[in-house]
């Protein structure tokens, strides 16, 4: 590994400086970004030297790890959060095969039944904004508790009701309850995982939202074929109830405002069963007093009223918008292919309902493989860039990314796989106009699912990287765009195919994706520079505010 400091430029050594022969890691995040920005001004001679000096590690408070949880515990926590987020897409798509039966049973038109789908999608995009803001302040466990209480109650009502008005209202509540868990999942990852390890964990956190649209039509088709449509909601009630019991007994509070790196004792409403048992064993008043003092500032914020408009501050950052829109379009393309697949295979291959449901299985497998493979690619590229710059990556330590090209490290993986997905989308569309073996389109569906899921996951990682500690808030915004763009592209694919044919309709979908992702080339090239300029402006603004405050005090 190359020596990170240039010996021709002497650097001031703090009292606790490391020996010269030690390798240098990414700057510890406990040193605020403004210090890095100010140090750039002190040594403007060389950009490489400037970066190296800012990458010098600093001692964190008490030298504590970023998270006290073990690697296996973190994997279980992320898996549990991912399963919690699985219920929203599961509930959305499992409903589709039963629409004709519901239309007949309630004696309503297809347009009226489709309105329940639209209502679900609208709430699926809006509800996480409230949940994300609440969980960032009150904690992840209270956020999950509210989500599942609403979701379980809605499922029970849907299983018992027989009126259109009740169906409309309860589907909206079902959407509001289940969709909030998606945003909290990435918040959990942001709480316990450092950027250098985040790739694989974010992928696992996204697997629920990827598998849901692919697997749920199969389950819904089986219920619609062999049972009464009410059993769809009984199944969701039983499944979610069985999940909630172990989840709320053992899932720990992770919000850093509440428990820090996991060492702090959470308030009563944030405790799981091990926390309660541990609290009972703490008999020494001094230890309890120290824990209360340590968490006083964190607990003070837990009762703040959630502000759903707070998430829109993300849109004030142009670089973030340039990342958000491609993420939404990627999932929109996925939903467009998913929505059009049933009609295409019925028209071309005359598949029955069960066979049509089975074609979603390869897409689910593609999404699952994406979750298992994408994270490793993302982490590998992160470490490759670190080695290239002579940077030592510290495990389980949060490290400053101000002078690290995190955009390039992430997008070098994201852009090629998305291009592969767009090529497969075009090929799929034109194959459906030809009399070819069914295995060809199915293989392309598998590759498209892998590609779009991988691209979406990597952009999720990048967004969480650029908003540390606010993963739930960023994910809520991504979810909003994903749902609204997905609803639009899913609604567009059928009339577009009728007007232009399968070949040109999917070609247009691919071209929309290419156009939406082209700004990411600028992000990859200038992203680090933009972040540094933003940090410098923030430091300058902070200095002016401090000076103004000092003048007022005088």
Curated annotation (Swiss-Prot):
Ribonucleoprotein found in the keyword field: no
Keywords: Glycoprotein, Membrane, Transmembrane, Transmembrane helix, Transport
Residue ranges, compositional bias (Polar residues): 1-10, 27-38
Chain intervals with Basic and acidic residues compositional bias: 39-48
Parts of the chain that traverse the membrane: 76-96, 115-135, 142-162, 173-193, 202-222, 231-251, 311-331, 354-374, 413-433, 442-462, 473-493, 504-524
PROSITE patterns, alphabetized: MFS
Source domain of life: Eukaryota
Gene3D superfamilies named in the record: MFS general substrate transporter like domains, Multidrug resistance protein D
Protein name: MFS-type transporter tstD
Protein source organism: Talaromyces stipitatus (strain ATCC 10500 / CBS 375.48 / QM 6759 / NRRL 1006)
